[in-house]
Amino acid sequence: MAGFRWFWDAMGGKNTRNQTKSKNIVAQAAKRGVQFASLSDADVVARAHECAQHSDDESRADLLALLSIGAQRSLSMNPFNVQLQAVLRILEGDVIHMATGEGKTLVGAMASVGYALQGKRVHSITVNDYLAERDAEWMGDLVRYFGLTVSAVTESLNTEQRRRAYASSIVYAPVTEIGFDVLRDQLVTQRSHAVQNGADVAIVDEADSVLIDEALVPLVLAGNEPGTAPAGRITEIVRRLKENEHYSVDADRRNVSLNDKGAALLEQVLGIQSLYDDAHIGTTLVQVNLALHAQALLIRDVHYIIRDGKIALIDASKGRVAQLQRWPDGVQAAVEAKEGLVVTEGGRILDTLTLQSLMGRYPIVCGMTGTAVEATDQLRQFYDLRVSVIEPHKQSQRFDEADRVYATQAEKFRALVKEIELLHTTGQPVLIGTSDVSESEELAQALQARDITVNVLNAKNDAEEAQIIAEAGDIGRVTVSTQMAGRGTDIRLGGANEKDRDAVVAKGGLAVIGSSRHRSSRLDNQLRGRAGRQGDPGLSLFFVSLEDDVVVVGGAGEEIKALPDADGRIDSKRITDFVAHCQRVTEGQLLEIHSQTWKYNKLLADQRVIIDERRARLLDTDQAWVELSEAVPEKAHKLSDKLDPAILVQAAREVMLYHLDRCWSDHLALMDHVRESIHLRTIARETPLDEYHRIAVREFKQLAQRAVDLAVETFRDVTIDQDGAHLADAGLTRPSATWTYMVSDNPLSNNNRSVINGIGSIFR
């Protein structure tokens, strides 16, 4: 992608586009603010409504001035010029790059009000429930000052509460809750049962995380229907297998392969002739693969924890429990069996939606993050979004030390502990970012053994994160945390109340240490950005070993020679450059996976739009009755003679919607199955993506007619009376229970291709 950037830069797609003009508008807003200061509240609101309807420079300047006055009067907050500049760029549809601690929450609220004053419905999208509730409450007075309404949607709300919340002018909500509500609304058979009423604008906090890192994560709506899981006996047998003797794991530990000796042992114990016979290849072998992958690749306290007797997945990019997430391919059940837990029931996937497709439902998408510049290419490629860099209110005083590279992880760990101990003796607060729960606990134990009190923030105690982070800048504080992305609490020097601020400043501010480099430089910078908030002093430093994942994966196939000192440290610019190269390679791999997956998902997303439009017509008009009465006129005439038209329209609607929803679910299952096996088509010298698209188009054309044909057949035979269509009597029932979850990245994939009978197994 780096080679592509020069092209669009030359075409005018600069990160800092229009910033001179924006600064001039902000300067004009400051002058207008003085003139507007004497206006009454009613006049401020009326003038803001008027200015919001226009997009010329003068109106924009006036609107910024009036929004600033509103913030002062309602929140006692006086926005800096850089915050007004950020508001302006969001109102122009950009993603803003704004450093941690620069006041993005106020910026997002002011921009939301600016859009809402135009008559647009705004969804202010957060990464979790805590931030949605916090921001809606914190910024609520500003919204209400301008005569608008505000609400928060969280997991705890019931259907009626959600419906009321979505009716607000501005809605704060986690992206997952919005997506799940979209999916649930796609099952309603009466418009009044839907909770959402659409929105015009999505303002996305942590935009790179939502729009890039999690863009292709499917949100799933499932119904109760048995799925496939490994039998208990198979789990016990697989537990006996030994790595390198019965199976092998590839270098990056993403794939595991059963060898002949392992297969022979399983066949002997199970009493079967061959795992690869037709009778077993789609059943027993699938279960063996599931159990083996769960046993060999998924590690407790790295990929998941056990909480309240249930598996809780860990979001690697955030270091916290991934709420409502589960694995695909029956892996979830396999891990539950491995850990001796109750195996959860599988289900039929009724509908699915990626976050990228969800964002496509909004006419306007914009946002803010502290690491937008690093995601510029992806935001441009996948969303046609531009990045505007907002300079900090005060220049950063943070010192970014060069990486300390060690030969082995053991040597790196010893040096890391020694450095933390040294900093702690000075009283300087230290925040250490680790890659997973297991590492955070190991590091905490090593520090505690040296009589250092440690606060640990990881997926096991993420409910306490706000308090732990708020105190991380206190004098002498040592905090160990898995990932800092999406943790919205600021770290203030001297503690939450800044009582010892001067003392901490004198000691150099907050020291942030990364225990390794991540596969994306954005994640490194999210951690680094916690130090040096609003011109504070600070320090950032990363420890790296040549055994770290980013080096092993990014440097695969390359030989590197180095001479470590007695402590294992390699002080060489050549090695430091090599580590940076490895990170760029892994970033390129992630981007390629995203790009390829997007190409597969794009056609299904387009087909979904057609299904949504068809469903809306059936839901909002009498189209279903018109089509069915034309197809079966005799029955339609008889029913019309004795039943109210409203009953007939609703009965026809339910018949049509049932078969449309069912056929769409079947289509998703089929295309997932096609995608799992599409790589085999390269053997026949066919292009996998082209073949996938050919099949998807062909099957979708058949879907439309099949749904209508089935509906006509049902309409002809089903009983329709005063109580409507008796679909249940005809064996046509919707699931009695549904649930939602996110499909975590499949840990058992190679080039984004499942090596076992994938998510389609849940459908069948």
From Swiss-Prot:
GO terms for cellular component: cell envelope Sec protein transport complex; cytosol; plasma membrane. The keyword Ligase does not apply. GO terms for molecular function: ATP binding; protein-exporting ATPase activity. It is a peripheral membrane protein. ATP binds at Q83, G101, E102, G103, K104, T105, D490. Transmembrane segments: none annotated. Its EC number is 7.4.2.8. It catalyses: ATP + H2O + cellular proteinSide 1 = ADP + phosphate + cellular proteinSide 2. It is found in: Cell membrane; Cytoplasm. It is an enzyme of class 7 (translocase). Gene3D superfamilies: Helical scaffold and wing domains of SecA, P-loop containing nucleotide triphosphate hydrolases, SecA, preprotein cross-linking domain. Keywords: ATP-binding, Cell membrane, Cytoplasm, Membrane, Nucleotide-binding, Protein transport, Translocase, Translocation, Transport. One of its GO terms (biological process) is protein transport by the Sec complex. It comes from the Bacteria. Belongs to the SecA family. Monomer and homodimer. Part of the essential Sec protein translocation apparatus which comprises SecA, SecYEG and auxiliary proteins SecDF. Other proteins may also be involved. Part of the Sec protein translocase complex. Interacts with the SecYEG preprotein conducting channel. Has a central role in coupling the hydrolysis of ATP to the transfer of proteins into and across the cell membrane, serving as an ATP-driven molecular motor driving the stepwise translocation of polypeptide chains across the membrane. NCBIfam families: SecA2_Mycobac. This is Protein translocase subunit SecA 2. It comes from Corynebacterium diphtheriae (strain ATCC 700971 / NCTC 13129 / Biotype gravis). The gene is secA2.
